């Protein structure tokens, strides 16, 4: 439940609901933090990169809002508006989601001939998605319809946290190569 505390209005407006949602999801605005014009520009290009790349990807949701206001740990954000509920996610949708995540880094590279640390969370999320595609969803032509590794989402008392992978070092290297190939293919697509 969202409660508007700062307003004395009798009715809650749509804007107040949206502002409260953004505050909960992205964190409070950092009003006391002074951001240089250079950092604002880098963030603007980065967030625009996400939006532009997403616009050209048919499986991605439309952009709802872009902000370069720092909130939480983020220098800015691009928020999407889901068109419909997604029960199943295709390989193409996941690949395009990775491409969209890397759109910010691509925009930095194209506009500044340099990159910065602002894309670290995007890269982490893109890598995680690619890893799931390869090791969990069987979406690798090279490695086939096999699940690799243990489900790390389930924690039980007494579980052996130092358990070894259920595959060889050769397979581990192949998994790493496949993950890198997926991410780099989508980065190349974002740069286009």
Where are these regions (language model features)?
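P-loop NTPase motor core
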Residues: 1-16
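Soluble catalytic regions of large protease machineries
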Residues: 40-45, 51-192
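C-terminal helical "lid" subdomain and adjoining coupling/linker elements of P-loop NTPases
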Residues: 17-19, 23-42, 137-145
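Generic detector of well-ordered alpha-helical packing
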Residues: 7, 47-48
């Amino acid at each position: 439940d969202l409660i508007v505390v700062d307003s004395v209005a009798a009715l809650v407006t749509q804007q107040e609901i949206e502002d409260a949602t953004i505050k909960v999801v992205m964190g409070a605005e950092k009003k006391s933090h002074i951001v240089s014009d250079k950092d604002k520009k880098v963030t603007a290009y980065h967030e625009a990169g996400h939006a532009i790349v997403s616009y050209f990807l048919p499986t991605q949701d439309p952009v709802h809002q872009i902000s370069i206001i720092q909130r939480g740990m983020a220098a800015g954000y691009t928020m999407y508006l889901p068109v419909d509920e997604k029960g199943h996610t295709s390989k193409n949708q996941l690949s395009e989601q990775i491409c969209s995540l890397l759109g910010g880094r691509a925009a930095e590279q194209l506009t500044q001939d340099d990159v910065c640390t602002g894309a670290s969370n995007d890269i982490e999320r893109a890598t995680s998605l690619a890893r799931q595609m390869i090791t969990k969803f069987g979406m690798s032509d090279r490695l086939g319809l096999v699940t690799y590794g243990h489900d790390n989402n389930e924690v039980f008392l007494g579980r052996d946290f130092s358990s070894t992978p259920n595959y060889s070092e050769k397979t581990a290297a192949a998994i790493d190569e496949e993950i890198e190939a997926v991410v780099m293919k989508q980065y190349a697509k974002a740069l286009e």
